[in-house]
UniProtKB/Swiss-Prot annotation:
One of its GO terms (molecular function) is ATP binding. Belongs to the AccD/PCCB family. This is Acetyl-coenzyme A carboxylase carboxyl transferase subunit beta. Its cofactor is Zn(2+). It comes from Haemophilus ducreyi (strain 35000HP / ATCC 700724). GO terms for biological process: fatty acid biosynthetic process; malonyl-CoA biosynthetic process. Residues 26-295 form the CoA carboxyltransferase N-terminal domain. One of its GO terms (cellular component) is acetate CoA-transferase complex. Zn(2+) binds at C30, C33, C49, C52.
Length: 296
């Protein structure tokens, strides 16, 4: 090897070595505008792209903790874990899928429920975790939802649920479909007793979740451009063999057609929910009267 080859080789090796020292996860590409973003900046911005304002998927536990007053969160039914009652197997065993999802997310299932305060108002909050098997709804999700709703009823406080789900969990078959009726029944009980329920639909909210609890809020809110519907647009197009309208099943389309009540930016969600909770429970607003956005 000549002296110049040795220098060039050493330079290339040094360059390659320096590249390999960049820790994984430092940069994230926006799924909308494809800009490369600094992950820490994106985290500070609550997973909203600072370039195009695209609302990326948001970790369920982080979402709830950022909503509640610091130090006020108490988890509800944290001990519940899914069971493979049917010994279900598709390409993989269900129990193996559960183990992999639990290892990946650090959560026991696709749903987290908490009690805490929002601007010192006691509330119950819940969120689907899309990273856990697509946020699918099984028996544990249904059970935790019911426990959270019962807590809200017992304390006579608002219940807020963030949806991000592909629908019912196929590996639990009929047990998962039963959760649609189970969650709808407890919400009917809440409505009968005057308990406020606010549903926040995030991207995506589909299948059995959209056909049950997600659309049963006293107020239904969506994040911008969230995909909301029963079947996905590709499935519908293949079935009807027609091109769907522009923006079909997106939050803006649903708002225009009266299926949801409002669209709220993630950065404004906490204050908006606080105003709504105060209004719905006849409590003093946590803000100045002039800042209220709810019309009489």
């Amino acid at each position: 090897m000549s002296w110049i080859e040795r220098i060039l080789g050493r330079t290339a090796s040094s360059s390659s070595s320096s590249k390999s020292k960049v820790p994984e996860g430092v940069w994230t590409k926006c799924t909308n505008c494809e800009q490369v973003l600094y992950s820490e900046e994106l985290k500070r911005n609550m997973q909203v792209c600072p370039k195009c304002d695209h609302h990326m998927r948001f970790d369920a536990r982080t979402r709830l903790l950022s909503l509640l007053d610091q130090g006020s969160a108490e988890e509800i039914a944290a001990n519940l874990e899914p069971q493979d009652i049917l010994k279900f197997k598709d390409l993989k065993k269900y129990k193996d899928r559960l183990t992999a999802a639990q290892k990946q997310t650090g959560e026991k299932d696709a749903f987290i429920t908490m009690f805490g305060t929002l601007y010192e108002m006691p509330i119950v909050v819940a969120s689907f975790n899309f990273e856990f098997m697509g946020g699918s709804m099984g028996a544990v999700v249904g059970a935790k939802f019911v426990r959270a709703a019962e807590k809200a009823l017992a304390e006579n406080i608002p219940f807020i649920c963030f949806s991000a789900s592909g629908g019912a969990r196929m590996q639990e078959a009929l047990f998962s479909l039963m959760q649609m009726a189970k969650t709808s029944a407890i919400l009917a009980k809440m409505r009968e007793k005057g308990g406020p329920f606010i549903s926040v639909l995030t991207d995506p909210t589909l299948g059995g979740v959209s056909a049950s609890l997600a659309m049963l809020g006293d107020i239904n809110i969506a994040e911008p451009k969230s995909l909301i519907g029963f079947a996905g647009p590709r499935v519908i197009e293949q079935t009807v063999r027609e091109k769907l309208p522009e923006g079909f099943q997106r939050a803006e389309f649903l708002l225009e057609h009266g299926a949801i009540d409002m669209i709220v930016q993630r950065k404004d969600m906490r204050d908006t929910l606080a105003r709504l909770c105060a209004k719905m429970t006849n409590q003093p607003s946590p803000f100045k009267v002039g800042e209220l956005i709810i019309e009489e």
